[in-house]
């Protein structure tokens, strides 16, 4: 399954706020699906499916990518759900978004693809690159790159930067300070339901 390229508002009306996908907020009105199921018990499968879809659309990844992340998380020590979220949050495109250097994760992915971003002074053009503690995220020393990201920071760095990240506005430099904790996730999600959804596939 490829990445979703349709209307983003339609997605957030169904799944709720997804800041990684769009900075728009859903209108509080019932969709036809909600109206038709208001008097019916929603199946457990559907609940798990919607939680899975939240992760997919928020982080802008394909079904195959998400399944691979679940498999990696299952083989790691610790809570599978929390490790899954850590893997997604430590993607380079998400780090750029959480630092306020891009308005959305798709916007951050575009910056990476166009080679505007350096990690530890080396250009990285892979959005899924897994960042680690003590990685420095900087902007390519080019006027166009600097202008794009400076404008983004001015408009979009209004949300509190999570504790595992640090941004130096003078140097225009981000730092991955540590592995994030569960409280720093920028999405309302029940990751255990996602793990349960993939229980027979991972």
Curated annotation (Swiss-Prot):
Kindly state one GO CC term assigned in the UniProt record: small ribosomal subunit
Give compartment(s). Answer: Plastid, Chloroplast
Q: Which residues form a coiled coil?
A: none
**Which UniProt keyword terms apply here?**
Chloroplast, Plastid, Ribonucleoprotein, Ribosomal protein, RNA-binding, rRNA-binding
Write down the InterPro entries for this protein, in alphabetical order: Ribosomal_uS4 (IPR022801), Ribosomal_uS4_bac-type (IPR005709), Ribosomal_uS4_CS (IPR018079), Ribosomal_uS4_N (IPR001912), S4_RNA-bd (IPR002942), S4_RNA-bd_sf (IPR036986)
Q: SMART domains from the xrefs?
A: Ribosomal_S4, S4
Gene Ontology BP, a term: translation
> Which Pfam family is one of those matched by this entry?
Ribosomal_S4
Q: Does the keyword Chloroplast apply?
A: yes
Show the PANTHER family listed in the entry.
30S 40S RIBOSOMAL PROTEIN (PTHR11831), SMALL RIBOSOMAL SUBUNIT PROTEIN US4M (PTHR11831:SF4)
Functional summary from the UniProt entry: One of the primary rRNA binding proteins, it binds directly to 16S rRNA where it nucleates assembly of the body of the 30S subunit.
Similarity comment text for this entry: Belongs to the universal ribosomal protein uS4 family.
The protein's name is Small ribosomal subunit protein uS4c
Q: Which organism is it from?
A: Splachnum sphaericum
